[in-house]
Amino acid sequence: MQWCTGAQFTKSITTGASNDGDDSYNSDVIIKRQDQLSYPAIIWCREKDFDWYLPSQKELVSIYKLIDLLNKRGINLHNKWYWTSQEDGGNKAYSINLDQDKPSSLHKFYHNYVRAIARF
């Protein structure tokens, strides 16, 4: 799934989704935008329910550290690239490969995995 659509990517828009906290701030920033439908990864997470959102780098690294335990419990995370909610300027956003714990800045129109998380 794309972080943003190819059409949105060509506009090189910076959304302000740059928080690395443990909350839905970045997703909330994008949901409030009039062009929110141009951000499929965030929309997909939010469509699960209002409490669901795309995790920050910090939150996704925490998931990475628990990947073996989560997979044993049936969560089925793959050692693939997953989007975080944090952008890196107008054309890139951070993604983490779950076989390592270091984020990389990738073009927003790339297709990566998405893992929604919820507040509790």
What are these regions (language model features)?
Residues 1-53, 57-66, 120:
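Short aromatic-cysteine micro-motif
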Residues 37-38, 47-51, 57-120:
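C-terminal, surface-exposed recognition/capping segments
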